């Protein structure tokens, strides 16, 4: 790797997976510790004026964007200011900016897979913010890659998987939608994709733009939950019961969560040669890490 790489957010689950996989291939990232209050315009300016990497992976707000149950509007507003400044700095210092986004920018009203050309219609406050973050990067920093991921799965406390497993161990009745579909995407796989993109950008390939990636095969949230419990019982045999099917419309998060969230991954395959991997193959490693830390 000729490019000097910087990673914001090396402490979260996706950042850790990226650092692990990079180390296996002797690819190093500058991974600065965030200030106590998190990255803001002033601290980003000081950092990039001094360091000036060739490419920057922005995972600074990963937990808020992809794992937290709720995010306060004030936090998203502050992040918007930070991303605006980050994009300006990347333009000024000629830094490639790679930033994740989400299936959540779509409303989930259509049953077929979403491509990068499909109309965006975010449902929730967080999804609307993610769309604005995308637009900031597109408008300000031409040398960018935006990666929209499917249902990101990791072992982090307070994340999607953690909530699911704590619920399963609580003994309460368990319900998941059997008519809500998406692409479960373990963080190990998402990290592989980010690394693959960086390697090709290192060869001076100007492949800027927006790309979709999700694990195969697409699944209902019920099927994903059941697969998770099968793996979890290898560590906690006493997990009492299985999930009961429920309609998407009856789920408490239905107003905010797209019912149909399957992403078409043809563009990333055709452009970068990145093939989707089976999420079920990587799920055991995440569950294993989860129970090692709990």
Where are the regions that the model predicts?
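Amphipathic terminal alpha-helices
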Residues: 277-294
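Mid/C-terminal beta-alpha module of Rossmann-like enzyme folds, strongest
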Residues: 193, 200-253
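NAD(P)-dependent short-chain dehydrogenase/reductase
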Residues: 135-182, 187-189, 195-196
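NAD(P)H-binding glycine-rich loop region in Rossmannoid oxidoreductase-like domains
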Residues: 36-82, 89
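Short-chain dehydrogenase/reductase
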Residues: 76, 112-134, 154, 184-185, ...
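Conserved Rossmann-fold NAD(P)-dependent oxidoreductase catalytic core, especially the SDR/UDP-sugar
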Residues: 84-121
């Amino acid at each position: 790797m000729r490019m000097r790489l910087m990673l914001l957010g090396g402490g979260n689950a996706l950042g850790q997976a990226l650092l692990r996989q990079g180390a296996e291939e002797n690819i190093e990232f500058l991974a600065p510790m965030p200030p106590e209050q998190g990255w803001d315009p002033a601290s980003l300016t000081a950092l990039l004026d001094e360091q000036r990497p060739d490419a920057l992976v922005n995972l600074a707000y990963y937990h808020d964007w992809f794992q937290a149950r709720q995010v306060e509007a004030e936090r998203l507003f502050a992040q918007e200011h930070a991303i605006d400044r980050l994009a300006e700095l990347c333009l000024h210092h000629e830094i490639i900016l790679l930033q994740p986004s989400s299936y959540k920018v779509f409303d989930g009203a259509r049953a077929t897979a979403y491509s990068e050309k499909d109309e965006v219609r975010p449902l929730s406050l967080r999804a609307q913010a993610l769309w604005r973050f995308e637009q900031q990067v597109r408008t300000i920093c031409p040398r960018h890659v935006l990666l929209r991921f499917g249902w990101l799965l990791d072992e982090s406390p307070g994340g999607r998987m953690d909530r699911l497993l704590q619920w399963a161990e609580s003994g309460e009745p368990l319900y998941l939608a059997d008519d809500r579909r998406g692409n479960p995407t373990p963080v190990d796989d998402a990290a592989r994709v980010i690394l693959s993109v960086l390697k090709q950008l290192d060869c001076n390939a100007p492949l800027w733009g927006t790309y979709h990636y999700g694990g195969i095969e697409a699944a209902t949230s019920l099927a994903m939950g059941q697969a998770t419990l099968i793996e979890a019982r290898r560590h906690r045999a006493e997990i009492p019961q299985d999930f009961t099917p429920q309609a998407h419309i009856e789920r408490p998060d239905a107003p905010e969560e797209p019912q149909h969230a399957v992403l078409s991954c043809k563009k990333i395959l055709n452009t970068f040669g990145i093939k989707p991997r089976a999420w079920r193959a990587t799920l055991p490693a995440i569950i294993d890490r989860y129970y090692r830390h709990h």
